[in-house]
UniProtKB/Swiss-Prot annotation:
GO terms for molecular function: chitinase activity; endochitinase activity. Its EC number is 3.2.1.14. It comes from Oryza sativa subsp. japonica. Pfam families: Glyco_hydro_19. Expressed in roots, leaves, sheaths and meristems. This is Chitinase 8. Keywords: Carbohydrate metabolism, Disulfide bond, Glycosidase, Hydrolase, Polysaccharide degradation, Signal. The gene is Cht8.
Amino acid sequence: MTTTTTRFVQLAACAAASLLAVAASGAAAQGVGSVITQAVFNSMLPNRDNSQCPARGFYTYDAFIAAANSFPAFGTSGGSAELIRRELAAFFGQTSHETTGGTRGSSDQFQWGYCFKEEINKATSPPYYGRGPIQLTGQSNYQAAGNALGLDLVGNPDLVSTDAVVSFKTAIWFWMTAQGNKPSCHDVILGRWTPSAADTAAGRVPGYGVITNIINGGIECGVGQNDANVDRIGYYKRYCDMLGAGYGSNLDCYNQRNFAS
């Protein structure tokens, strides 16, 4: 190959790489990426790549955007800028708690989201222990998520903790999907959920608190004030403040019965 030909190939490769970078940047600048920019993502999760975090290097901005783009209604369909930003604050608030490496009561407690990608106690429900931003747990959830995403997550659950795009997709899938008598987190935060008579009797009212109930109500709800609720709310408020969104009402589930009761 001549020097001229080699130079041409190198230039072509550089041009192709530049086009891919521009395309990725353009995709990020639309939809969710218009609110959660790379800079905002880094500011929200400043310690995710800390040397103390087992998930360091895993949760990338590009992986989040790629996953979000697979769910066009996620973080884009609130009907107002306020609700769009509130949904994203709520999503990151809940998932940051699920993956937190923060120390309760410390000054930077709510700056340690996305520190973990796998549950610490893997004996909880092997091999379907918690993985990813939402800590997807249990064979039924791996089956349902896999069916929705076109992946064999029952046969290969480790995909959720080894492929960052898949990991984010499972979290967003859970967020967007109603299951049984539980509404979707998406509908709740956008004010599209109307409680049934049973919900009202159980104290389940629209707001961030019922999202906690959807995710982990069997442990955290109906038991009065507890550290987990406080942590979820703290992350949520921090992100609302960063994104310029109001908190809404009913932030906790202290007095709500869980959906299985």
